[in-house]
Amino acid sequence: MASFTVAQLRCEYRENPLGIDELRPRLAWQMRTRRRGARQSAFQILARDEAGQTLWDSGKIESDQSTQIEYAGPELRSRQRVTWQVRVWDEGGVSVLSRPAWWEMGLLEPADWTAGWIQGGLVGGPRTIVPAPLLRKSFTLAKPVAAARLYVSALGLFEARLNGQPVGEDALAPGWTEYAKRVRYHVHDVGSLLVPGENVIGALLGDGWYCGHVGFQGRQRYGERPRLIAQLEVVHPDGSRTTLGTDGSWAVAYGPLLQADLLMGEHWDARLEMSGWDAPGFDAAGWQAAETWQGAAPSLVARNGPAIRRIQELAPVADPQPIEDFGVARWLFDFGQNLVGVVRLQATLASGVTLTLRHAEALDADGRIYTANLRSAQQTDIYTSRGGAQVYEPRFTFHGFRYVEVHGYPGAPPRDLLTAVVIHSDMPPTGAFSCSNPLINQLQRNIVWGQKGNFVDVPTDCPQRDERLGWTGDAQVFAPTAAFNMDVAAFFSKWQQDLADAQHENGRIPPIAPDTRFGHEDGGPAWADAIVIVPWTMYQRYGDARLLARHYASMKAWMAYLAETSPGRIRAHPDGVPRQGYGDWLALDGSGGTQGATPRDLIGTAYYAQGARLMGQIAQALGKTGDAKRYARLFEAIRRAFIHRFVTDDGLLIGQTQTACALALRFGLLPAKARSGVFSALARDIAARGNRLSTGFVGTPHLPFALSENGRADIAYALLNQRDWPSWLYSVTQGATTIWERWDGWTKDKGFQTPSMNSFNHYAYGAIGAWLLSLIHISEPTRPY
């Protein structure tokens, strides 16, 4: 018998996915053995239908590949379940067949949907916080239940209920997409929740990203109220089916959730709870008929990324501390970690007692919560007691916080009054870093916590203030680090679709995706280039050629747009049409602004060249040799234009900042005679600053690589080990538990930075993680893993 087994079978990056719409799903597995040097030499896949009949037998395929294996059987149909197994060979033998795994198809055709969109009556307006609707439908099943599926989605957020029980464990479902194009539906196995006789299906809706506050544009950016679509399909033992969908026969009412806003928080008045509203036997005589919605609905697509989940819980690290504020007692809870999520309240309170919970990342000099950096976001949850023992956990909001201030509790609250619930997209950890320096180890922990908090369905810049947007520049610089820390293949595959959906018809890419501003403006250098950089990074890390192929047309359209708007192949030219972008955002070498001293046309042209180089590699990977040659020629042409404009006859860079040097060196833009001079200038600048960096969002990820790739890893180490600001370790020495937005978010001599832009959970500078982890892996990957 072979001394190895096959385990962790995955389909489309998920274990046993329920409801997918990939017609040729990709399969993956792991070979497990204790023998060093073991290597798969061949594999065989067996796939069967629901009746156990063979759909596909791959036969023995000589290959060491164990990921991205495309199903090659007959065409799949809606709702079909496929069970599959794998056996593998190594040089010494063959494994037994793996344990069976499965995947199930979703609803592949629009005609599969018989349900329609429904909603409650219109309440409030763009400037008004509105209550959350409850929707319910009572129905009777005349036969026993063999199997059942609930296909459900919302414009907004939903929590589905069946017979008094929650359906699934997802949070903030169905997430955030480019609503003009598509919205994702979730599929749940609900057979165990149904019974013969009366049943009740229900849903609670929240505003979410669809009609709540999003970014800094206020409410109702996409729609005026949340909407629900749900289709319950029941299979009976005799093979017959019962289908129930949302329509005008559903009932709607407003209950205890008076406010459900991602940025502002929740207000739950437990006195308004309607016990049993989602279960049989409830009297819904006072409820109104739900409204059907006939508007231009987005396409319904199966969930293709990881679900948002409640991942872990944290208890306060100390007893709550009293804070006297104008004679009013407030209590401060410290969870010891800047996190993203909510707090669960568990208490016995008299009826009518109202607790106000305010969330913050930091404390001010007086020991009170610091909220100035939240701007207009309130991050406040309010709970009014119904009397007795009760538990409350917000459903449709999330906060960025370490501290929670509680107001209204009668007396001194116990430490276990609150429990922090950490929420983020469910991404398995895949990498770790540890060394002999505890500060660097804490830096790595801060990077990981920053990734957790900002990977909530969309890679956001920050999780606390009135922004929380999918900034493309932040995402592309951090993507290599993210892929080391966690399995982000499905996460970025989903977001890449958001980015493509936000693309303007002329090819330009906006600075954020989903695009809440609807102008689809040019995101500018290093931001809009995410359309090319992120899928290439995913290909390097996961070998995901389908992602490249699926978005190749979008990438080509983007490159064509750049060709049209870059006179003389100089992108972001001062005399050009498109905006010049954000420069080296928050660099310290500027004259007091936010964009740094590096010329924006230098950054733009450097990224134009890098985009052409990557497009050549992408085309080559896809077998498009003609395009590969064309983009290689384009890279050389842009390189010549870069040299002509930015490299002097003496071999120096015009605008010779740390970022300019790092980009020119890493992107291969310099003539051979200029490389040593530019690198020497970079080293001198770092030394002149006392082994400190001056880079912003654009230059920082490339700086340590530029140094180590040119034989001076010692300088990169000196930057890494620097404890005075600006440095990675400065925030660590100040007690940070996540990555700060600014190098000087807080200093002893100046206190807090400008509150309008001072997040304490901003992963961009955490891009150093890719360099840290490359030390273990020796080098950046030159081919897909």
What are these regions (language model features)?
Residues L157, R227, L232, D247-A253, ...:
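Active-site acid/base region of carbohydrate-active enzymes
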Residues G191, V200-H213, G218-I229, V234-H236, ...:
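Repeat-solenoid scaffold signature
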Residues L134, A171, Q217, G388-V391, ...:
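Active-site-adjacent structural elements in folded domains
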Residues I776-Y785:
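Single conserved hydrophobic/aromatic residue that forms the stacking wall/gate
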Residues A2-R465, G473-D474, A490-S493, P510-R517, ...:
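Extracellular/oxidizing-compartment recognition motifs
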Residues A148-V152, L162, V342-E361, E393-F396, ...:
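Alpha-helical support elements that line or immediately flank enzyme active sites
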Residues A475, I509-T516, L693-V698, L719-H762:
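C-terminal catalytic domain of Rieske-type non-heme iron oxygenases
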